């Protein structure tokens, strides 16, 4: 699955495939986030996501564009944070500083971190919920 040919295929095609139908991919992402939030709300369980919001087979190769990746990651992080069910939200699968292409835009990370940190947690997670209380204590 993770051969160099796979990465070359992603580099060659992924952005084009996304840009041909961005609304489709964005709606697919937000619909799945809303579905997970709905299930979490029904079960009164908090969500934490560390690997998220888009493509995972992307490398920090020279000249790769990150704007479309960042657009999807921003949409995913903000959508998740607004549900109130996520108590831990990563900005992307590439949020580690080893991804130079992603970290060129430090302000993007700061802005998303601010949105995530200021998003309220759903009240259903706070009342009489031992599981959520234990997790939230650790955060």
Can you annotate each of these PLM segments?
Residues 59-139:
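Aromatic-rich peripheral "rim/lid" segments of glycoside hydrolase catalytic domains that contact
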């Amino acid at each position: 699955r993770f051969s160099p040919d796979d990465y070359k295929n992603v580099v060659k095609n992924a952005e084009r495939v996304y840009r041909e139908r961005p609304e489709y991919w964005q709606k697919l992402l937000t619909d799945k986030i809303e579905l997970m939030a709905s299930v979490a709300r029904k079960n009164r369980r908090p969500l934490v996501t560390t690997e998220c919001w888009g493509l995972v087979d992307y490398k920090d190769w020279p000249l790769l564009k990150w704007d479309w990746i960042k657009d999807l990651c921003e949409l995913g992080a903000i959508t998740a944070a607004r549900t109130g069910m996520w108590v831990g939200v990563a900005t992307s699968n590439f949020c580690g500083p080893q991804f130079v292409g992603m970290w060129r835009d430090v302000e993007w990370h700061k802005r998303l971190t601010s949105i995530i940190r200021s998003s309220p947690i759903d009240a259903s997670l706070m009342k009489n919920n031992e599981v959520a209380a234990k997790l939230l204590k650790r955060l």
